[in-house]
Design a protein with these regions (language model features):
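RecB-family 4Fe-4S metal-dependent nuclease core
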Residues: 1-223
């Protein structure tokens, strides 16, 4: 699932980078081709299988996932891409934290000409409003947008291609960020930094969705 997201992301990046100047989307086939190439490159770099996938032929599993990448990339080209005129794509940013031993770095998927900050996702279910309202990632992106442009983001957005067993759809959930959110982010960074410096690494709570073989790359080595 993670690798197919990498593939779709590669297709989006390929299109949006040229759209900054051209103001036109590439043909769908070009976007899909870039997505498949990104997926294949990710697979070549290594992958892990769930227990269910391990019981199947590996080539069949990879072929099935490639088909999903094609479906998702087609939807991206048809529904997501036309909605945005990008001004920055995969924008690296470093936020210097005063009186802090470390800086905060991130890469913003897309900033557009309406001062919107967009995080593209692929998932098996729709995102909730709570997902957007509480996303630390979106808060970091909004802070980075303000640092880069001097302006508040008009909107932060989770724009997700949702793939279920029966269909592929688009889901958009929007939120906003302000000064109070940035203060809360700074406090969170301070807590995390203190934990790192003191060597306190709290394990995930068993039973949470990310503490599973499907979503955690460290599942096989976790004590």
């Amino acid at each position: 699932a993670m690798l197919r997201g990498t593939g779709v992301h590669a297709g989006a990046e390929h299109n949006f980078e040229q759209k900054i100047e051209s103001h036109e989307d590439l043909p769908s086939d070009d976007i899909v081709g870039a997505a498949v190439a990104g997926f294949e490159e990710a697979v070549a770099g290594g992958y892990s299988l769930t227990d269910d996938e391990a019981e199947k032929n590996v080539k069949d599993v990879i072929g099935e996932q490639k088909d999903v990448v094609v479906d998702m990339a087609k939807l991206h080209a048809a529904e997501q891409a036309p909605d945005y005129q990008p001004v920055a794509v995969e924008q690296y940013v470093r936020l210097e934290l005063p009186d802090h031993p470390r800086d905060l770095v991130g890469v913003i998927d897309l900033m557009d000409d309406q001062d919107r900050v967009i995080d593209f996702k692929t998932a098996g279910r729709k995102k909730s409003q709570t997902d957007a309202d509480t996303s630390t990632q979106l808060t970091v992106y909004a802070a980075a947008h303000k640092r880069l442009t001097g302006r508040d983001a008009t909107e932060v957005r989770l724009d997700t291609v949702v793939k279920t067993k029966t269909k592929t759809t688009r889901d958009v959930v929007s939120s906003t960020r302000g000064a109070a959110d940035f203060d809360a982010l700074a406090n969170r960074v301070n807590v995390i930094t203190h934990a790192i410096e003191s060597g306190t690494f709290t394990p995930a709570t068993p039973g949470t969705w990310w503490c599973s073989q499907k979503f955690c790359g460290y599942w096989g080595t976790c004590p």
